[in-house]
Regions:
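Catalytic Walker B motif of ABC-type/P-loop ATPase nucleotide-binding domains
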Residues: 159-162
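A short, proline-enriched helix->beta-strand linker immediately N-terminal to the Walker B motif
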Residues: 153-157
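Short coil-to-helix segment of the ABC ATPase nucleotide-binding domain corresponding to the Q-loop/switch region
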Residues: 94-101
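Helix-to-loop junction immediately C-terminal to a conserved catalytic motif
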Residues: 49
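Helix N-cap at the start of a conserved alpha-helix in ABC-type nucleotide-binding domains
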Residues: 170-172
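Conserved ABC ATPase signature
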Residues: 133-138, 142-144
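Conserved ABC transporter NBD signature motif
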Residues: 57-65, 77
Length: 232
């Protein structure tokens, strides 16, 4: 599903955000990527979203080498991805239904399919009764669930979650994780970047640890905090 082959990313200021990274993620896998700020997690996500290009090496997603994508092909590629950020990024002047529907409208999905699929995904994340509310009327946890619904409504093959529990209380964070696990069990590949050691250590998932742009650990379960210090 995802392959990084000898990937290096160096910026103009001389900083090497990634150094010779090799990583393979199988289809249907749930993967945590962890590390201190500046370790390379955000660069991995930006490369997957094709916001930046590698200085060296290949990034391959679902058999497609992203460096070979033409500019006009990038929007079509991104439609196959679901992305959830820490800061929700909901449109404040649209209802929750409209926020989720918008993700389908920009891909020109027929209205009948939108009307069928949006309520379905809102019910899945527990927001069926909040469809007509605006983001400002929702709690932080509800807003994150709305953002998750928006990311899932186009049925992505890969879901990228960048610190999705970062601003949430523990109980709400657990709710978000249960949804992510459910989505993964249905076949979606999930890649989650996080600092939440309690969440990582409570789940029997693969954990890849970055430090100074390199992978320093790749294993199952989240004992990485015993190996890499100062992760916050």
């Amino acid at each position: 599903m995802i392959q990084f082959k000898n990937v290096t990313k160096a910026y103009d200021n001389g900083i090497h955000a990634l150094q010779n990274v090799n990583l393979k993620v199988e289809k249907g896998e749930f993967l945590f990527i962890v590390g201190a700020s500046g370790a390379g997690k955000s660069t991995v996500i930006k490369l997957l979203l094709k916001e930046i290009e590698p200085t060296q090496g290949d990034v391959i997603v679902d058999g497609v080498n992203l460096s070979h994508l033409k500019r006009r092909e990038v929007p079509h590629y991104r439609r196959k991805l679901g992305v959830v950020f820490q800061d929700f990024r909901l449109l404040e002047d649209k209802t929750i239904y409209e926020n989720v529907a918008f993700a389908m409208e920009i891909t020109e999905v027929p209205r009948a399919e939108i009307q069928r699929r949006v309520p379905e995904v809102l019910n899945m994340v527990g927001l069926g009764r909040k469809a007509d509310d605006y983001p400002g009327q929702l709690s932080g946890g509800e807003q994150q669930r709305a953002a998750l619904a928006r990311a899932l409504v186009n049925r992505p093959t890969l879901l990228i979650a960048d610190e999705p529990t970062g601003n949430l209380d523990p109980e709400t964070a657990d709710e978000i994780m249960r949804i992510l696990v459910t989505v993964n069990r249905r076949g979606t590949t999930v890649l989650m970047a996080t600092h939440a050691k309690d969440i990582v250590n409570s789940m029997e998932k693969r954990v890849v640890t970055f430090q100074n742009g390199r992978i320093v650990s790749d294993k199952w379960k989240g004992e990485y905090f015993d190996e890499v210090k100062n992760m916050e």
